Amino acid sequence: FYGKHYDRVYITSLFTFYYNQTVKTIKSYEKLISPEKIFIGGIMVSLMKEKIKEDIDDRISILTGLLTDSSILGLGDSVNIDIRPLDYSILDDIVYKYPAGDNYFAYISRGCTNKCSFCAVPILEPEFCMTNNIVQQVKTIGEEFGEKKNLLLLDNNILSFSENELEQIVSDIESLGFDKKTKFYKELPLKQFMRKLHRYESDTIASKNVLEETLLYLKEKKKIKKSKIYQEKYLEIMGKIECSEDKLQVLFENENELIEILDFYHRPVGSRRAVDFNQGMDARQLTDEKMRILSRIPIEPFRLAFDSIKYKSIYSDALKIAAKYGVSSFSNYILYNCDDKPEELWERLKVNVDLAKELKVKIFSFPMKYAPINRTDRKFVGKFWNKKYLKNIYAILNVTKGIVADGESFFFKAFGRNVEEFYVILSMPKEFVTYRNYFEENGLAAEWRDKFLQLSIEEKNELLQVLSEKRTTQNSRLSELLG
C-alpha cells in the first residue's frame, strides 16, 4: 500500500464487537491518504453511525444501509450495487481455500417481516421485499466465474413469502438444475484455471496464486498413460512450461492442446447438489403447503431457528412437517444469554435429541451467544446468566467445534442427564469441562461434585459470584472447591 497512488479506499465493517479494530483500521488509512478519499460502510457502521462519527475524521464518507444507488459514492450513474453478483475473484487473492467456495452465494429478498428485539435486520433492511432474480444471479455468476455445485441463499426469512410466491421461487431454483434428480458434473479444472488467468492482469496476487495452483495441477497430471500420443505431447508441453521464464505465456500458447488432452481423460462423476437457506427458516411460518413446495428442491441441511423455549411446540411441529416430506438432515440456531434461563438452553437441546430419536433424523444444533447490537464488545451477561456459566458453555462448545450433535449419550455426557446435572457442569472448574475424561478417570471430578452438592443455595450463589468476579472468599468450604 505504501508509496502507491489510490483514488479511493473503501472500508467495510462487520459486527459491532469489532468496533475498536475497525476504528483502528480507519485511522491507519487516515495517515496514508486524504480522508476525503476514504469511504466506510457495512453492518457496524450502519448500526453505530453517530458513535463512529465521534471517533474518526469528519471528512470521511459514511455510508449506511444497503448500497442500492451508486450515485451516493459520487459516481456518474445510479446502479443498484446491492443486487450485483459477488466478486468471486477475491478468493484468489489468498492461498487459503474457502470451504464454501463451490457455492453460488445469492439472495432473493431483503428484510424480514419479524421485528425481533435481538436482531439487526429491522435496522439494516427495514422493508421485506423481493429484490433479486435468482435465475439471472446464478447465470451471471456461472458465466463470469464458472459453474458452482451448490446454492447458498442468504435470505433472512424466505417463508415470509406467500405460497404462490414461494412456488415461483422454487420453480426458478429447479430450472437452474437444483432439483432432486439432476446431478452436478464438475468441469475440467484446467478450464476454470484458464478462465481466471485470462481475466486477471499479470503480476497481480490473484494471477500469481492461480498460476501456481494451475502448474501444480498440471504437474499432477503428468502420470497420464492411456494414450501414448497424448502422453508424449503432454510431457513435451510441460517441458516447455517448466523450462520457460514466462510460464504464463507458454501456458496461453498451449492452452487449447492441454485442454484437448486432459478432456480426453476427464471422467467426472455426477454428485448431488444442495440448496442451503443459510440464515434459517421461521418455524412459525412453515405450513404443510409451503413444505410441500420446498420439498421439490434438495435442501440440506434444513435450518430452523429455535430462539426461545416458548416456541417448543411450534418448532417441534415444523420439524415434524419437514420430516414428513423427506427431510432427514436438520440444523438449527439456538440463541442463549438473552432473555432465557440456562435450563432453557438445556431443554431446547434435549428437544432436538428427542426429536432426532423419534423421527430417525439428524439434527445438529449451533448455540449462539447473544450480544446486543449496540455494544462494542462481547462481554454482555444475560439477566439469568453469569460469567462462570458462559465460560463453561464456551468450554463445552469449544470441544465440539460449536456443534451439538443429536446423540443421546453424547448429549448426556456434555450437558448432563437433567437440568440439575447441567447446573453442576456449568459450575465446575473450566478444566474439568475441557478435559472431562481425565478428571473423571482420576476421580477429581466426582470428588468436586460431591462437595459442591453439599453446599447450600446461598453458598452456591457465592461460589458463582467469586468465580465470575475473580474475588476471594472467607468461606472455607468454598475455598476447598476453589483449590
Regions found by a protein language model. Give the residues of each.
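Conserved acidic residues
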Residues: 6-10, 60, 117, 149, ...
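Canonical Radical SAM [4Fe-4S] cluster-binding loop centered on the CxxxCxxC motif
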Residues: 98-136, 145-147, 160
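A structural motif corresponding to the C-terminal lobe/cap of the Radical SAM core domain
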Residues: 280, 292-457
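A short helix->loop->beta-strand "cap" motif at the edges of active sites that frequently abuts
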Residues: 31-38, 58, 273, 326-328, ...
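Glycine-rich beta-alpha loop elements in corrinoid/cobalamin-binding modules
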Residues: 1-101
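C-terminal non-catalytic accessory extensions
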Residues: 454-483
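Short, aromatic/basic amphipathic alpha-helical patches
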Residues: 24-29, 49-59, 168-173, 347, ...
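Conserved SAM/AdoMet-binding glycine-rich loop
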Residues: 140-331, 336
